């Protein structure tokens, strides 16, 4: 048996271990909820936990379908394990953290380096356009209440550029491997042309990245079709390692494929796609759109009618998958097994 075959068998054992992890922290005490240690893999048949993590790090260097997870930053006093980057499944390739500009608790910040070195997981700072618009709207409401004139379109565009820069700078401030550029539409009700706002945002990213992005990773997620209308879209897409398309409320692969066909016509590259699905929330267990395991099955399957690459899966609200009785991150772990083995492990 050659070395590569042995490595392959051992990796398959790791995926079995991933699928078998259960919620060890429990809900019995506050200390269990807040301790920051990683929920590491139970050792496979012949590996210690350290050896298992070494195999996962090695696997992440090989061609495979990637898993990207999104989580929220907590600026002070995390109270639950799901708020910790270290609690995310060991086999996640990337974690992007939202709202780092609002600050990150020191304990959580220290875990960024730990997951990078221990698990080989890349950590990205999220740069969110909607958050910028929301901040602008709040500022305008305060001005109106104070009887002051609201900002002009020119001031709004300058605000976008400045706030984009501040979010981008979180990459280096927290030792991240790169950035996730999130454009999920225009939410502002106090400004005019949303196209100008979108253009200011992407141009600010593009200019900053050309000066500060050497050796780092950039991805884009959201409404890629809208980004395609920006004047630097071709160059910007060229910089991105992955382009993350939102499945949204769609439940059929055909509907998603139709969206990609339209994107391609409008200039979005077809060879960088990762697809984003969501898990139900603790407050509403209704599945919206394609489930994470179903999305993984579609992504791992080949099709002669799909003229685009399916490179992996993104889960925007990964933290919500923590809340399972008896098993944390159940849908994500199932999806990881499906993506990397083509089959679903026994549940």
What label would you give each PLM region?
Residues 71-89, 153-172, 226-235, 288-304:
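Short, acidic/polar
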Residues 66-70, 124, 202-230, 240, ...:
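Aromatic-lined carbohydrate-recognition surfaces of secreted/lumenal glycan-active proteins
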Residues 1-13, 17-62, 67:
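Bacterial Sec-dependent N-terminal signal peptides
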Residues 63-130, 134, 331-338:
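N-terminal carbohydrate-binding/catalytic regions of secreted carbohydrate-active enzymes
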Residues 83-89, 107-123, 169-174, 231-238, ...:
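Acidic (Asp/Glu)-rich catalytic clusters
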Residues 251, 271-347:
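Substrate-binding cleft of secreted/luminal carbohydrate-active enzymes
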Residues 91-100, 228-256:
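Aromatic- and acid-rich polysaccharide-binding/catalytic face
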Residues 100, 104-197:
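Substrate-binding cleft of extracellular glycoside hydrolase catalytic domains
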């Amino acid at each position: 048996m050659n070395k590569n075959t042995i490595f392959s068998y051992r990796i398959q054992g790791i995926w079995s271990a991933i699928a078998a992890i259960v919620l060890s922290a429990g809900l019995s005490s506050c200390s269990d909820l807040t301790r920051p240690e990683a929920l590491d893999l139970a050792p496979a048949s012949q590996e210690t936990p350290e050896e298992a993590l070494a195999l996962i790090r090695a696997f992440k260097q090989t061609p495979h379908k990637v898993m990207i997870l999104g989580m929220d930053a907590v600026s002070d006093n995390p109270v639950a394990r799901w708020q910790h980057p270290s609690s995310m499944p060991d086999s996640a390739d990337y974690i992007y953290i939202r709202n780092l500009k609002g600050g990150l608790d020191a304990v959580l910040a220290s875990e960024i380096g730990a997951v990078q070195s221990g698990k080989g997981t890349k950590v990205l700072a999220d740069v969110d356009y909607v958050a910028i618009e929301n901040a602008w709207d709040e500022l305008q409401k305060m001005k109106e209440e104070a009887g002051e004139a609201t900002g002009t379109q020119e001031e709004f565009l300058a605000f976008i550029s400045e706030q984009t820069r501040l979010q981008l700078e979180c990459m280096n401030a927290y030792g991240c491997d790169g950035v996730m550029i999130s454009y999920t539409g225009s939410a502002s009700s106090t400004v005019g042309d949303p196209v100008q706002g979108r253009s200011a945002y992407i141009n600010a990213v593009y200019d900053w990245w050309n000066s500060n992005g050497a050796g780092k990773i950039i991805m884009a997620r959201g409404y890629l079709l809208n980004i395609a209308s920006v004047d630097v879209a071709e160059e910007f897409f060229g910089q991105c390692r992955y382009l993350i398309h939102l499945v949204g409320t769609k439940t059929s692969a055909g509907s998603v494929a139709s969206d990609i066909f339209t994107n391609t016509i409008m200039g979005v590259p077809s060879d960088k796609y990762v697809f984003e699905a969501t898990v139900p929330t603790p407050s509403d267990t209704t599945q919206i759109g394609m489930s994470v395991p179903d999305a993984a099955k579609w992504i791992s399957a080949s099709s002669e009618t799909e003229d685009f690459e399916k490179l992996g899966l993104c889960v925007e609200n990964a933290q919500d998958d923590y809340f399972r009785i008896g098993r944390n991150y159940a849908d994500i772990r199932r999806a990881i097994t499906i993506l990397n083995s083509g089959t679903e492990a026994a549940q």
